[in-house]
């Protein structure tokens, strides 16, 4: 268990210098001195020292070596001419037992992250490439296996390092938190809105009270005046707990977004007979923004799909009515009038199924009526840029190929520069302009899809998720 695997005579100064990792010494077993140049066996610099290891728990030096475990990493040697030399780095890590507090501990290292199969310098290169390409494509370029267990680790490390280099976040007066779904996973998006400027603040890994609480802990809570929320119970509870003095609102944008989702459910159900180009996007647009060609496509479709026609006509009437003064009873009344729209769209004697998809909107309005009324009482509503920003983010997420959260998070937070602001001589970051963010996200999607179509890039994830 505690037997030493190497003797000091096997230390290779040249290979240690080539490896250039301050913590490690390269040693060579007799059978790999000349034949296995791509394999570097290493030990900690203290391996041949007679000094006792210090227990990290009680600081005692009354410790003894218990075992040695070999850990294999992929690494890339530093090069002045840009040449890539990828090696197998095998680190023989020692474990110790403290005779005082009885804890077992290992040699502490910082050349690689816990749970990652790449050294930090290689993982940083892989993470940088994965910001704009698929992880598998980048790993293939470097000639290393695409470790599924490591991708999250390397992207989290890259994001953490980059954010740590930025100035602190300036807490915005107005927050917008909405909960989009990316391949069936809910990833809350946090925006700030200041006049007509909408900026991305962060993306959270899940919609839970604990996730929100962690994010809110980084804000100056007294500075937040208004928070626009989605009808999400976890979000609702977390916001009221963290910001008891702020105004909590549900905006017109949010209500219309959920109504569009209900219309989308109808479109999906009636979709076998719907021949409209980009049907979800086109059928959800206000009629005044439709081209003549789109109007003809919709007209032909509605003549065949009478249930969809009832939902579509009702939706268009609602958009017109909400351009004026509206309130919760008015929208609930619109939902109650849906059977009349079905009757107007049905042929004589035709019995169409009720539009139960919109019952969800009624539930939302009844549960969150105080937050909607708080919004309606505002003297100045949020700029139209908010609705455009949310729609642009949803569209870009819908088009982006599947990736795990850590990749998506890094792509959204690191590909566009954060805007900065100086307050009382101190520099702060204020977020990422959403228009630049979505433009970059769409560029990344185009790059990935183009390479797939050309057969240059094949991305197979561990799961086979899809939109729901």
Feature locations, PLM:
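Inter-helix linker motif
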Residues: 245-264
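Short helix/loop capping segments that flank catalytic or ligand/cofactor-binding pockets
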Residues: 53, 106, 137, 185, ...
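Mobile genetic element proteins and their domesticated derivatives, centered on retroelements
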Residues: 43-44, 58, 98, 138, ...
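Short, positively charged, Gly/Tyr-enriched micro-motifs
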Residues: 75-173, 179-184, 222-225
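Acidic/histidine-rich catalytic cores and adjacent linkers
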Residues: 52, 57, 61-64, 222-225, ...
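RNase H-like nuclease fold core
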Residues: 150-238, 245, 450-453, 457, ...
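Short, conserved DNA-binding cores of transcription-related domains
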Residues: 1-103, 109
């Amino acid at each position: 268990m505690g037997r030493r695997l190497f003797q000091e005579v096997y230390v290779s100064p040249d290979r240690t210098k080539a490896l250039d990792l301050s913590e490690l010494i390269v040693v060579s077993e007799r059978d790999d001195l000349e034949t296995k140049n791509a394999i570097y066996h290493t030990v900690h610099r203290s391996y041949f020292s007679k000094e006792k290891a210090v227990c990290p728990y009680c600081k005692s030096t009354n410790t003894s070596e218990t075992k040695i475990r070999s850990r294999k990493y992929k690494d890339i040697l530093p090069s002045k001419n840009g040449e890539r030399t990828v090696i197998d780095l095998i680190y023989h890590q020692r474990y110790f037992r403290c005779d005082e507090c009885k804890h077992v501990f290992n040699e502490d290292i910082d050349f690689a992250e816990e749970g990652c199969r790449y050294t930090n310098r290689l993982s940083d290169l892989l993470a940088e490439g994965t910001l704009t390409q698929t992880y598998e494509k980048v790993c293939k370029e470097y000639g290393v296996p695409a470790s599924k267990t490591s991708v999250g680790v390397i992207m989290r490390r890259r994001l953490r390092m980059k954010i740590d280099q930025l100035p602190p976040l300036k807490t915005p007066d107005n927050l917008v938190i909405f909960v989009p779904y990316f391949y069936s996973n809910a990833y809350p998006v946090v925006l700030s809105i200041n006049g007509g400027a909408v900026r991305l603040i962060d993306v959270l890994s899940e919609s839970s009270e604990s996730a929100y609480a962690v994010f809110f802990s980084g804000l100056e809570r007294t500075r937040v005046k208004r928070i626009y929320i989605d009808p999400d119970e976890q979000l609702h509870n977390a916001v009221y707990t963290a910001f008891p003095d702020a105004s909590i609102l549900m905006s017109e944008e949010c209500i219309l977004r959920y109504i569009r989702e209900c219309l989308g459910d109808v479109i999906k159900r009636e979709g076998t007979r719907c021949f409209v180009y980009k049907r979800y996007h086109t059928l959800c647009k206000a009629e005044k923004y439709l081209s003549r060609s789109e109007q003809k496509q919709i007209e032909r479709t509605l003549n065949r799909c009478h249930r969809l026609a009832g939902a579509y006509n009702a939706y268009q009437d609602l958009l017109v009515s909400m351009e004026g003064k509206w309130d919760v009873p008015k929208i609930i009344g619109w939902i109650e009038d849906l059977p009349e729209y079905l009757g107007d769209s049905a042929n004589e004697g035709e019995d169409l199924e009720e539009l139960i998809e919109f019952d969800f909107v009624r539930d939302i309005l009844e549960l969150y009526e105080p937050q909607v009324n708080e919004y309606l009482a505002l003297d100045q509503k949020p700029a139209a840029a908010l609705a455009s920003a949310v729609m642009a983010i949803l569209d870009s997420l819908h088009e982006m190929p599947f990736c795990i959260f850590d990749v998506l998070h890094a792509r959204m937070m690191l590909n566009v520069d954060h805007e900065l602001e100086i307050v009382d001589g101190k520099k702060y970051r204020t977020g990422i302009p959403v228009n630049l963010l979505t433009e970059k996200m769409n560029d990344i999607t185009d790059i990935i899809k183009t390479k797939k179509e050309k057969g240059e890039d094949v991305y197979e994830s561990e799961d086979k998720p899809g939109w729901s």
